[in-house]
Regions:
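Extended catalytic cores of very large enzyme megasubunits
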Residues: 1-718
C-alpha cells in the first residue's frame, strides 16, 4: 500500500508540475506534495526532528563532531525552532532543486537524511555560536529572505566546510616552477568546489627568447591548454567539472591568439573548450579605440611592471615603453577591438572587464603595490592578488522580493537583514576550510565579503515599474545605497567588537575615504557612517558584490540577481524531467482581466515567451513584461552605473542582444566603459532555432530550446 501511495504521489507531483504553465498556483501544489515525499523518505531512516537529522548525518560521517555536539546539547531548543509550514513558501522547482542537490543523503542508500527546514537550520547552526544566532539566520533562510551561496549551503557543518565561492589567482611568474605551482593550486581549489579566476599576463608571449635554452617560447596557448585539461579533470566535490576564467591584459602580444581559444574552427591544438576568457582592459586602450589610433603589443618579459600598474602610472609607463620601441608589433586599436567584439558575438566569451575602473576606487588599493589583476569566474569579485595571496570571497544574496510591504520596500526590514547577513558572512571567514595556504592568508588578512541581491525583477513587476523607467532607476539605486549603508555600519560595529581586519591600515577607508566618496557628494547618513569607521575601523575590506544567483534564486522562487527576465515562458530542468514555467506576475494580470486562455498560452509559447505581438494584450502589460531581448541595453548599463557607487566590488552584468553585430557591440561596450562600469559578464545571444513550441498542438512541434547560448555558469557564485 505504501508503494502505491508513493507512486500515486509522484504521478500527482508530475501532473501538477506539468500544469504550472496553465496556472502557476500548481507549482505550490507540486511543492507541498514533494515536501510530503521528502518527509516520508527521511522518516524511513528515523529522521523526524532536526536533532534526529543531525544524529543520522553525523553517524553517516557527513558532518563535523562539533556541530553534532552543539545540536545534542541544545536539541529541544533547536527542534522547537523548526517551522515545517515554511515549506509552503517553496515553488516546486525551488524545492526540487533543494531535494536533488542540497539535502544530505545516506552514502549507500542515497536516501535523504534531512528535510528542507532541517537543511536550513543545519546551515545556520554550522555558522553560529549560540542557539539565538542560529535562530536569527534560520529565520531569514526559512522565509527565503536571504540565502548564502552554494558552497556554504553545501558545506556548512560538514567535515571540511569549504564555504567560499570564489578564488582569484595572480598570474604565475614567467618560470616553469611557478607555472606548475599554479596548476596545483587551481586543482586543489577546484576540488573543493571553488570557482577559479586566474590571470596569465606575466607569462611571456610567443616567439620570446628563452635565454636558458636559446630557444623561443610557444607563448601562453600551450600553457592554457594544460590548464584547460586540468580544470576539466578535477571535478568540484564530485558534483560537476571544474570551472575557470583566464584574464589577459590587452597589451599582451598573444592577445589575438587568446581571443581565438574558444573558436570552434581552426587548429584544435590551439583551442581550449572549458576555460572562460576575459579581457582585462586599460583605459588607454579604450581611448585609442575612440581616437582610432595604433595599439602596441608587448612581451611581458620585456615590460614586467605593466601588469602591476594602473591609471596614470600605467599610461606613462606604457607610452614610455612604446616610445623606446619595446613593442613586439603594433595594430590599429579598432582592429583589435573588433576582434574582441567578434569573439563576444560568436562565443559569448571574452568578457570585457576594465582594469582602471576596478582599481581606481577599490578600498584595497589604497597603498602602492596593492593591485587588482583580475576578476573572478562571474566578474563580480575584485580583490588584490599577489604571488603569496589568493583572493577569496564568501557570498550571500538578499531576496528583495521578500522585503516588499504595503506597496513598497520595507526599508527597516531590509536593513535588519543586511546586518544579519554581514555578520554571518564575516563568520564564514573564520569557520571555513581553505584548500591552499595562499587562500587562507589572503582571506584572513583582508576579510572581504560579497553581499548581493536577487529578485530585483520581482520588485519591479510587483510595483509595476518598467525595467527602463526613471522610477525603476531611482528605486534600484536607493536599494543599493541602503544595503551599503547598513553593511558598512555593521562592519564598523564588528570591528569594535572583534577587531579590524589586519590590513585595515593599507586601505582607503583608513584615510577616511569610503567607496561612495569616489562618486557622489556625501549625505548625512554617510557622514555618520564615516565617523563610525574613523573611530572603529572596518572588520571587512570589501562588502558588496552582486553575484549571478541562478541556483539560489531558483530555491527562493525569484528572478536572478539584478537581471530582467529572459522570457515570460521558460524551461526548468530537474532530475525527473523538463517542465515549462511561466511568469506568475503576467499570469495574475491576465487572469484579472479574463485573458489567460489556452489560445493565449499557445500564442505566448509560439512567440518565444514574448507578449509584444500577441493580439489582445493591453499596452501597459506589453511595456511591463518586456524581456531582456526587448529592453534597451543602455538601460541595463545605466542601472548598473547608478548603483555602482554603492558596490565596492562589482556586479555580474549580462548583456543581451538577439542578433549581435560588431557595430552594435562596439557601441554598447564603449558606452559601458564611459559609464565607468568595472566589469561585464556574458554577452547573451539567441540561438538560430526558435524557442519553445513544446506543448502547442501542431504537427511540427519542437522541444523547447534553451533561450541562451553559452549556458556555462559558476555554481559557486549561486
Amino acid at each position: 500500500m505504501t508503494q502505491i501511495i508513493e507512486v500515486d504521489r509522484r504521478l500527482a507531483i508530475e501532473e501538477a508540475a506539468a500544469r504550472v504553465i496553465a496556472d502557476p498556483a500548481n507549482s505550490r501544489v507540486a511543492a507541498r506534495l514533494l515536501a510530503e515525499e521528502i518527509a516520508d523518505e527521511a522518516a524511513a531512516h528515523g529522521v523526524r526532528t532536526f536533532s534526529e537529522s543531525i544524529a543520522a548525518t553525523h553517524a553517516a560521517g557527513l558532518i563535523q563532531d562539533g556541530l553534532a555536539e552543539f545540536v545534542a546539547a541544545h536539541a529541544a531548543e533547536l527542534d522547537a525552532l523548526v517551522r515545517a509550514e515554511a515549506d509552503d513558501r517553496f515553488e516546486y522547482f525551488g524545492l526540487r532543486t533543494v531535494y536533488d542537490r542540497y539535502l544530505l543523503r545516506h552514502p549507500e542508500t542515497r536516501a535523504v537524511l534531512e528535510r528542507p527546514q532541517h537543511f536550513f537550520l543545519r546551515v545556520a547552526c554550522g555558522l553560529s555560536e549560540s542557539v539565538a544566532e542560529a535562530a536569527e539566520l534560520y529565520a531569514l533562510m526559512s522565509t527565503l529572505s536571504y540565502l548564502p551561496s552554494s558552497p556554504t549551503l553545501f558545506n556548512s557543518g560538514a567535515r571540511r566546510p569549504q564555504l567560499s565561492s570564489c578564488f582569484l589567482l595572480d598570474s604565475p611568474r614567467d618560470e616553469l616552477e611557478a607555472i606548475y605551482d599554479r596548476y596545483g593550486q587551481v586543482a586543489r581549489l577546484s576540488k573543493y568546489a571553488g570557482g577559479i579566476g586566474i590571470s596569465w599576463t606575466r607569462v611571456r608571449s610567443r616567439g620570446s627568447l628563452i635565454r636558458g635554452t636559446n630557444g623561443h617560447s610557444n607563448g601562453i596557448v600551450p600553457w592554457l591548454r594544460t590548464l584547460d585539461s586540468s580544470v576539466a579533470a578535477v571535478n568540484q566535490g564530485g558534483r560537476r567539472k571544474g570551472a575557470a576564467c583566464v584574464y589577459l591584459e590587452t597589451w599582451h602580444a598573444d592577445i589575438e591568439e587568446f581571443l581565438e581559444l574558444r573558436d570552434n574552427t581552426g587548429e584544435d591544438a590551439r583551442r581550449t573548450h572549458n576555460l572562460n576568457l576575459a579581457n582585462w582592459v586599460p583605459d588607454e586602450f579604450m581611448r585609442r579605440v575612440e581616437a582610432d589610433e595604433v595599439w602596441s603589443l608587448f612581451d611581458p618579459k620585456e615590460v614586467p611592471d605593466l601588469t602591476d600598474l594602473y591609471g596614470d602610472a600605467f599610461t606613462r609607463a606604457y607610452r614610455a615603453y612604446e616610445a623606446a620601441g619595446r613593442h613586439v608589433r603594433q595594430i590599429p586599436a579598432r582592429t583589435l577591438y573588433g576582434r574582441m567584439m567578434r569573439t563576444l558575438a560568436q562565443t559569448g566569451n571574452g568578457w570585457m572587464t576594465f582594469k582602471d575602473a576596478a582599481n581606481r576606487t577599490s578600498n584595497q588599493t589604497g597603498r602602492p603595490g596593492n593591485v587588482i589583476h583580475l576578476s573572478n569566474l562571474c566578474t563580480e569579485i575584485l580583490e588584490v592578488t599577489s604571488d603569496a595571496e589568493t583572493a577569496v570571497c564568501n557570498l550571500g544574496s538578499i531576496n528583495l522580493a521578500a522585503h516588499l510591504d504595503d506597496g513598497g520596500v520595507d526599508w527597516d526590514r531590509l536593513r535588519t537583514t543586511v546586518r544579519t547577513a554581514v555578520r554571518f558572512l564575516d563568520r564564514t571567514i573564520d569557520l571555513g576550510f581553505y584548500p591552499t595556504p595562499e587562500a587562507e592568508a589572503a582571506n584572513k588578512r583582508w576579510r572581504p565579503i560579497g553581499l548581493g541581491v536577487m529578485g530585483l525583477a520581482d520588485v519591479f513587476f510587483t510595483l509595476r515599474l518598467p525595467f527602463d523607467s526613471p522610477e525603476a532607476l531611482e528605486l534600484s539605486t536607493r536599494i543599493a545605497e541602503e544595503i551599503a549603508l547598513a553593511a558598512y555600519d555593521t562592519s564598523a560595529d564588528l570591528a569594535a567588537e572583534r577587531g579590524r581586519h589586519p590590513s585595515y591600515a593599507e586601505t582607503r577607508a583608513a584615510g577616511g575615504v569610503l567607496h561612495p566618496d569616489h562618486y557622489v557628494t556625501g549625505t548625512e547618513q554617510w557622514d555618520a557612517v564615516r565617523e563610525k569607521v574613523a573611530r572603529s575601523g572596518l572588520r571587512n575590506s570589501l562588502m558588496i558584490a552582486i553575484a549571478p544567483t541562478a541556483t539560489i534564486a531558483s530555491i527562493a522562487g525569484c528572478y536572478e540577481c539584478i537581471e530582467p527576465q529572459v522570457s515570460n515562458v521558460f524551461k526548468r530542468e530537474t532530475l525527473s524531467g523538463e517542465f515549462l514555467q511561466v511568469n506568475r506576475y503576467l499570469v495574475a494580470d491576465l487572469q484579472a482581466r479574463g485573458l489567460w486562455t489556452q489560445q493565449l498560452r499557445d500564442d505566448l509559447k509560439r512567440a518565444d515567451g514574448s507578449v509584444q505581438t500577441i493580439p489582445g494584450i493591453p499596452d501597459d502589460l506589453k511595456v511591463l513584461y518586456r524581456t531582456a531581448w526587448e529592453l534597451p541595453q543602455k538601460a541595463l548599463i545605466d542601472l548598473a552605473a547608478a548603483r555602482q557607487p554603492y558596490i565596492d566590488q562589482s556586479q555580474s552584468l549580462n548583456l543581451f542582444m538577439a542578433s549581435p553585430t560588431i557595430g552594435k557591440l562596439s557601441s554598447m561596450y564603449a558606452y559601458a566603459w564611459k559609464r565607468g562600469l568595472k566589469t561585464t559578464y556574458y554577452l547573451r545571444s539567441r540561438p538560430a532555432t526558435r524557442i519553445a513550441q513544446t506543448t502547442v498542438q501542431t504537427p511540427s512541434a519542437e522541444a523547447i530550446a534553451c533561450s541562451l547560448e553559452n549556458p556555462e555558469t559558476c555554481e559557486a557564485c549561486q
